[in-house]
UniProtKB/Swiss-Prot annotation:
Residues 1-66 are annotated as: Disordered. InterPro entries: PH-like_dom_sf (IPR011993), Ran_bind_dom (IPR000156), RanBP1-like (IPR045255), RanBP1_RanBD (IPR045256). Belongs to the RANBP1 family. It comes from the Eukaryota. It comes from Saccharomyces cerevisiae (strain ATCC 204508 / S288c) (Baker's yeast). This is Ran-specific GTPase-activating protein 1.
């Protein structure tokens, strides 16, 4: 038996992996020490500060903006200030288009008989709903005649020689329709009363 065979067999233990050098080693050679991780106490302090900031902030701030331009209130005149309303009724107004040979709707709204306090003249004024644009504006002249509209007992047709709804006086043939026969009859009655007033004015 050789001398090599006589050597005792020793179990080799697994060598432990070397640990990385600590931060102290680096600091010895001018290296920067590793920063300590934030402790639990630091986290609590941060949360407390955030909470205090939240308590200081108003829950519902009152935001107020000053207008850039100050607008003054303007009184809009309708030219009805010096007139008295004698009669008012809801109606739909049509005008006859001679070129197209058909009736065209002019507007729906309140039709008013207005008496001027200075001249005592009575005129018809009708404004469209929502837009309030004038669709009829003329004196109820004594020569105007209301005629029944064919096929309807709640509308009238009459020729107007000078309607100024569009600015300049124009001649139109109007048809005015009401919600009921009673309103149509009442309109005729008030129309003829206004004609009598205008005869004397």
């Amino acid at each position: 038996m050789s001398s090599e065979d006589k050597k005792p067999v020793v179990d080799k233990k697994e060598e432990a992996a070397p640990k990385p050098p600590s931060s102290a080693v680096f600091s010895m050679f001018g290296g920067k020490k590793a920063e300590k991780p934030e402790t639990k106490k630091d986290e609590e302090d941060t949360k407390e500060e955030t909470k205090k900031e939240g308590d200081d902030a108003p829950e519902s701030p009152d935001i107020h903006f000053e207008p850039v331009v100050h607008l003054e209130k303007v009184d809009v005149k309708t030219m009805e200030e010096d007139e008295e309303v004698l009669y008012k009724v809801r109606a739909k107004l049509f005008r006859f288009d001679a070129d197209a040979k058909e009736w065209k709707e002019r507007g729906t709204g309140d039709c008013k008989f207005l008496k001027n306090k200075k001249t005592n003249k009575v005129r018809i004024l009708m404004r469209r709903d929502k837009t309030l644009k004038i669709c009829a504006n003329h004196i109820i002249a004594p020569e105007y005649t209301l005629k029944p509209n064919v096929g309807s007992d709640r509308s009238w047709v009459y020729a107007c020689t000078a309607d100024i709804a569009e600015g300049e006086a124009e001649a139109f043939t109007f048809a005015i329709r009401f919600g009921s026969k009673e309103n149509a009859d009442k309109f005729k009655e008030e129309f003829e009363k206004a004609q009598e007033i205008n005869k004397k004015a």
